[in-house]
Swiss-Prot record:
UniProt source species: Bos taurus (Bovine)
Repeat positions for ARM: 261-300, 303-343, 362-402, 407-448, 461-502, 505-546, 550-587, 589-614, 617-660, 662-703, 705-744, 746-788
Annotated SUPFAM superfamilies: ARM repeat (SSF48371)
Protein name: Armadillo repeat-containing protein 2
Keyword Cell inner membrane set for record: no
Bias-annotated ranges (Polar residues): 60-75
GO BP annotation list: cell morphogenesis; cilium organization; nucleus organization; sperm axoneme assembly
Superkingdom as given in the UniProt entry: Eukaryota
Job description of the protein: Required for sperm flagellum axoneme organization and function. Involved in axonemal central pair complex assembly and/or stability.
InterPro entries, sorted: ARM-like, ARM-type_fold, Armadillo, ARMC2
Keyword Hydrolase: no
Keywords: Differentiation, Repeat, Spermatogenesis
Length: 865
């Protein structure tokens, strides 16, 4: 006899998919999403690698006459010598120079030192550099050096009788004459002396002033050099005295400057001139390159880099002449020094062109890396004026673009701040464009190079992190808005976003920028037939709408969003119909092929539609849109799974999501039988992904009585029962959902006994129950519907199945046993949620029903007579 509770259970309606009007738990929402609504994945559009390194690739929208050249010649004559002069208030006369060491003091200018032979020892040179620094300090403290005369050809040390402070007594330090009073102050601060051969000696004041020489006539300025004038107090100074102090200060500044110049002359003649002499006479390229490296180090040590060095013009002329040698390695060495000397204008352009020309050959990447040319190029971008050097920046960025495609440079570029530098330039271009109200000349060409470089860099996780930290994505959107007429720029940024939105954090960042949706729609409308750009924009939209319901809503609310997608769908559906050869029956199909261009757009587009359909406010509208549904069905009709697997699967997934909505004006519901006919092709294919999508659609459609009749008439139910043996959880889940809907109709419950359906359901419960409580719940609901009119458990399910069900259900309803899996805490919570809300209620009801209609008495043996 049934208990009151059991009688209530007996009157329950058959288990069915939850009603839309019912308030759903979170578990039900997850369950429904698994049943009916799901996002669609796809691959990022394929970008072929360019065979040649050029400013603009073969797919560029720029015509040859409307873009800067990638091929050109750079010679010594290309450079301007006028730029070689140092920046100063005085215009300097050109210097004639031959990189040959002077033979004697008579052959050089009167202010130059003769350089000693042999060349100075490197250890001594380092000491010279230290002495130069001390000399600067002396000058700043008032021990100013007057002009000097030519020095003796051999280094000498002044040693004679003790110093006596007289009018004409002087001391020579580092080849420069000083009065004794100044020299004493110098020695107190700096006990080291630099002799002419670059050596230092420890000396005392007494040694220093033994045998003071006479000041040459041209150094004498009158007055007692050994006496100091008492300094008047500030309170007693007269205006005349103040003017005298100012003049004295100006004179001191001039003397300090002269001192620096003379110290530079010492370094120039002892270090630089011998190297230039070697450059002139050396014929071996490797030795010339080594000498260039030596020259760069010497210039750096002597603080002679930059654009203010007096001898810069002589140096640059020598370097320019060596460009004609034509060696790539030598040219890179020269370019690095020239850039370090801060050339400008045409010379900056030519040196950037020179490096660009070398970088076009991939085999030179190792040379560029070994010489750290990247650092010099980034310094150009960081320090030079963008508007004044746009063309130079163009070729500089061209080189950086080339090497950014080499993974070996990725770490170096990240470490040297390449991402930040590029985004700073892009922001500057945006601001200049906004300020002027129009795109500046050549800015588009430059943006192509910068965005192509960023496209290569975003493969690095560090680059993506930096872009997010500096809020770079809105800046890139602004570039697209301002240069929407430049297809090359827009395509590069679309490629950047294609990569970035494949990562969740970047996808969220772009989705939160509300202006991006209208921008992407404008791009689709403007470049509707430009497949390489459109396919990426649609791919980006698919990423944005994949897991973000707010993005789905925001995009759908943009003016013309659905009509734009419809127009694009229609355009590429027509293109696909008329493109390429259709495979005939006798044709041998390749095992795998890349989708055609039109197919690829359709793949990405159907994915966007499938994702949008998940939103409850958008899905019903699309399901009621006759043109969109018509194109989906036409695609499914014209394509087989062998023609284009991804397109067929995505189209079926979109139909599945749309079939979830039971609205009056749904085109899906109106044409459900036609859709069921189309799905039969997928069910009999050998593609398990295609079969799974078809079964999912049948899971939604089979809630309709007409579809249930169709399933039985076409023997689709037998196929569903067979799929229970697939040992694939998702396939078993979807097939069980169809069988559950069939058992709602009392007339169709007996079909579960065909093909061993009951046993297979019990096997699914045993195999997948402990790891998939949603699937276990579906199995129990199906068996509950099937056993509504049960009188005996053994006759209803069969003896073996009934006993197995009793054992399984009793075990699975024991919480300790059921949830004792080796899962992490999050997964345990997930399993417990579904076990408590979905499995336990129906499993307990089914167990009670079986117990109440099951006898545990064993049959007696038949007596023998």
């Amino acid at each position: 006899m049934l208990s009151p509770n059991d009688k209530k259970l007996e009157k329950l309606d058959p288990f069915y998919l939850p009603s839309l009007s019912k308030q759903k738990t979170s578990a039900e929402i997850v369950s429904e999403a698994r049943n009916a609504l799901r996002t669609v994945r796809t691959q990022r559009p394929f970008t072929p690698r360019e065979d040649q390194r050029k400013l603009f690739g073969p797919a560029s929208s720029r015509t040859p006459e409307n873009r800067p050249p990638s091929s050109f010649s750079v010679h010594a004559s290309s450079f301007e010598f006028s730029d070689s002069r140092p920046i100063s208030g005085t215009r300097l006369s050109p210097l004639e120079f031959k990189p040959k060491a002077p033979a004697s003091p008579d052959t050089v200018e009167d202010f130059c030192l003769s350089f000693p032979k042999p060349p100075v020892d490197p250890a001594k040179i380092r000491r010279i550099s230290s002495a130069r620094a001390r000399l600067f300090r002396v000058a700043s403290q008032g021990a100013l050096l007057p002009a000097r005369t030519l020095l003796p050809t051999q280094p000498t040390r002044v040693e004679s009788e003790e110093t006596v402070t007289t009018r004409d007594s002087v001391v020579k330090i580092n080849g420069i004459y000083l009065t004794e009073s100044k020299a004493i102050g110098h020695l107190k601060r700096h006990p080291l002396q630099l002799t002419y051969d670059g050596d230092f000696s420890k000396i005392t004041e007494q040694e220093m002033f033994k045998g003071a020489t006479s000041v040459p006539f041209h150094l004498r300025s009158g007055g007692d050099q050994g006496k100091r004038r008492p300094r008047a107090s500030s309170s007693s100074r007269s205006p005349d005295q103040s003017r005298l102090d100012i003049r004295a200060g100006s004179k001191a500044d001039l003397q300090e400057k002269n001192t620096e110049i003379e110290v530079d002359e010492v370094f120039w003649n002892t270090r630089i001139v011998p190297i230039l002499h070697d450059l002139e006479k050396e014929e071996n390229i490797e030795m010339v390159c080594a000498t260039c490296t030596q020259l760069h180090h010497a210039l750096e040590e002597g603080n002679m880099l930059g654009n203010k060095f007096k001898r810069r013009s002589v140096l640059l002329k020598t370097l320019y002449k060596l460009v004609d040698v034509g060696s790539d390695l030598l040219s890179l060495k020269l370019a690095k020094i020239i850039l370090a000397l801060k050339v400008s204008g045409k010379n900056l352009l030519n040196v950037c062109k020179l490096i660009f020309k070398i970088s076009r050959s991939e085999k030179n990447d190792s040379l560029i890396r070994n010489d750290s040319i990247l650092e010099s190029l980034l310094e150009v971008l960081r320090s030079e004026d963008l508007q004044a050097n746009t063309e130079a920046f163009l070729y500089c960025m061209g080189t950086i673009k080339f090497i950014s495609g080499n993974p070996e440079f990725l770490h170096e570029m990240m470490g040297k701040g390449a991402v930040e530098i590029l985004m700073s330039l892009i922001k500057q271009v945006n601001e200049n464009t906004k300020k002027s109200g129009t795109c500046l000349p050549n800015s588009g060409h430059l943006l192509v190079q910068m965005t192509a470089t960023l496209r290569n860099l975003v493969d690095s996780p560090l680059a993506r992190s930096k872009l997010l930290s500096i809020n770079a994505l809105p800046q890139l959107c602004t570039v697209m808005e301002q240069h929407i007429g430049d297809k090359d720029v827009c395509t590069n940024i679309a490629r950047i976003f294609s990569k970035l939105t494949s990562y969740h954090d970047c996808c969220v960042a772009l989705a939160s920028y509300s202006r991006c949706y209208a921008l992407f729609l404008n791009l689709i409308n403007k470049y509707q037939k430009k497949q390489d750009l459109v396919v990426r924009v649609v791919f980006i939209l698919g990423n944005l709408t994949a897991k973000n319901n707010q993005a789905r809503e925001q995009f759908s609310k943009e003016k013309g969003s659905i009509p734009t997608l419809l127009s694009l769908f229609h355009t590429f559906y027509k293109l696909d119909l008329h493109s390429g050869k259709r495979w005939g029956e006798g044709d041998e199909r390749p095992e795998a092929r890349r989708p055609a261009q039109a197919e690829d757009v359709l793949i990405k587009l159907t994915r966007v539609l499938a994702n949008l359909a998940i939103h409850p406010g958008v899905g019903p509208a699309i399901a009621a849109h006759s043109h969109i549904v018509g194109l989906l069905l036409a695609t499914l009709e014209s394509k087989s799974i062998d023609d284009c697997e991804e397109l067929v699967i995505n189209t079926t997934a979109t139909i599945n999501n749309l079939s979830y909505y039971k609205v009056k004006n749904s085109i899906i519901q109106d044409r459900k039988l036609y859709i069921a006919e189309l799905l039969l092709k997928l069910l009999v294919s050998n593609n398990m992904d295609g079969i799974l999508e078809a079964v999912r659609v049948f899971g939604n459609l089979s809630q309709d009585h007409d579809i249930c009749d169709f399933i039985v008439q076409k023997n689709v139910h037998k196929f569903m029962i067979a799929l229970l043996d697939a040992k694939h959880q998702d396939i078993c889940f979807s097939a069980c959902g169809v069988l559950l809907n069939l058992t709602v109709d009392r007339d169709k419950r007996l079909i579960l006994k065909e093909g061993g359906g009951i046993k297979k359901l019990v096997d699914c419960l045993r195999d997948f129950g402990p790891t998939d409580w949603q699937l276990a719940s579906l199995v129990c609901k199906t068996l509950w519907n099937f056993s509504e009119n049960i009188t005996n458990a053994a006759s209803c399910f069969g003896d073996e199945a009934a006993n197995t069900l009793l054992a399984l259900l009793s075990s699975f309803l024991d919480e300790e046993l059921a949830l004792n899996g080796s899962f992490d805490q999050d997964l345990k919570n997930y399993h417990k949620l579904h076990w408590e809300t979905e499995f336990r209620p129906v499993a307990q009801q089914l167990l009670n029903r079986i117990k109440n209609h099951h006898t545990f008495l064993e049959p007696l043996p038949i007596p023998s007579f």
